[in-house]
Every structure is written in C-alpha cells, then in structure tokens.
From Swiss-Prot:
Belongs to the KRTCAP2 family. The chain crosses the membrane at residues 1-21, 35-55, 69-89, 92-109. It comes from Aedes aegypti. Keywords: Membrane, Transmembrane, Transmembrane helix. Subunit of the oligosaccharyl transferase (OST) complex that catalyzes the initial transfer of a defined glycan (Glc(3)Man(9)GlcNAc(2) in eukaryotes) from the lipid carrier dolichol-pyrophosphate to an asparagine residue within an Asn-X-Ser/Thr consensus motif in nascent polypeptide chains, the first step in protein N-glycosylation. N-glycosylation occurs cotranslationally and the complex associates with the Sec61 complex at the channel-forming translocon complex that mediates protein translocation across the endoplasmic reticulum (ER). All subunits are required for a maximal enzyme activity. Component of the oligosaccharyltransferase (OST) complex. GO terms for cellular component: extracellular space; membrane. It holds the Pfam family Keratin_assoc. This is Protein KRTCAP2 homolog.
Length: 132
C-alpha cells in the first residue's frame, strides 16, 4: 500500500540518515574485507535511492504533484552525495556504489514507466492517395 508523499519524504529522509550514520559508525568494519567493501557500495546505492526519493518527494510537496526529478540536478546531486559518503568509508565503496546505483536507477526507471506511462493508442489511418 502506498503512503502519502509527505510520509514518504519523512521515511526516506530518516532511513537515508540512518544508513549514512551506520556507514560512518561501522567504517572500520566495512573497510576490513573485500566483501564488506562491496556491501558498503551496496549500502551507498540505497543511500542514493533514498536521498533521491526524499528530494523528489520534497519537490512534489513544495512545487506540486506534476513535478518530476530530472537527470540534472536531482539525480546528479544525490549520486554525488552518496559517492561522497561512500568515499569517506573506502574508495572501492564509491566505485561499487556507482555500479549499484546506475543499475538501481535503470530498474526504477523501468518500473516507473510501466506504472505511470499509459499506452497511447496509435491511429493507423492510411488515407487515400490522390491521383495526379
């Protein structure tokens, strides 16, 4: 069941702050092994998705329901922020964060297009050709 935009804004913001603080608290553990570093990048991609959700919901609350997040500045700003957060933990976390974030953004875009873009019927009328 979907929640209202304002509730989604609060939930995404709080969860993003919790993920950021957990990454900073467990920085030595995340940087200790290769798998933990990849997991840190995965957490960073969740930070990206949640911050993008929060920014998009904030724009929807302030600017109206029809507003959509664009590649620049919303997506770029959130990606740079999550890369900065991952880079403070480990450099490889930032690299894997890019990979996971791009993949997540692709699938979220596909789901969004399926849900929100209704197919438009195409008019296939050929018409009569004039003889000269």
């Amino acid at each position: 069941m979907a929640v209202p935009t304002s509730v989604s804004l609060v939930l995404a913001s709080v969860t993003a702050v919790l993920i950021f603080s957990a990454m900073q608290m467990y920085k030595p553990l995340i940087a200790s092994s290769q798998m933990a570093t990849v997991f840190g990048g995965f957490l960073g991609s969740w930070l990206f998705i949640l911050s993008l959700t929060a920014v998009s919901n904030l724009e929807a609350v302030v600017l109206g329901k029809g507003f959509q997040a664009k590649l620049f500045p919303e997506v770029a700003f959130c990606l740079i922020g999550s890369l900065f957060a991952c880079g403070m933990v480990h450099r490889v976390c930032a690299t894997t964060c890019i990979l996971f974030s791009v993949a997540a953004l692709y699938y979220i875009n596909r789901i969004s297009q399926k849900v929100h873009n209704a197919p438009v019927p195409v008019d296939t009328y050929a018409g009569k050709k004039k003889k000269k």
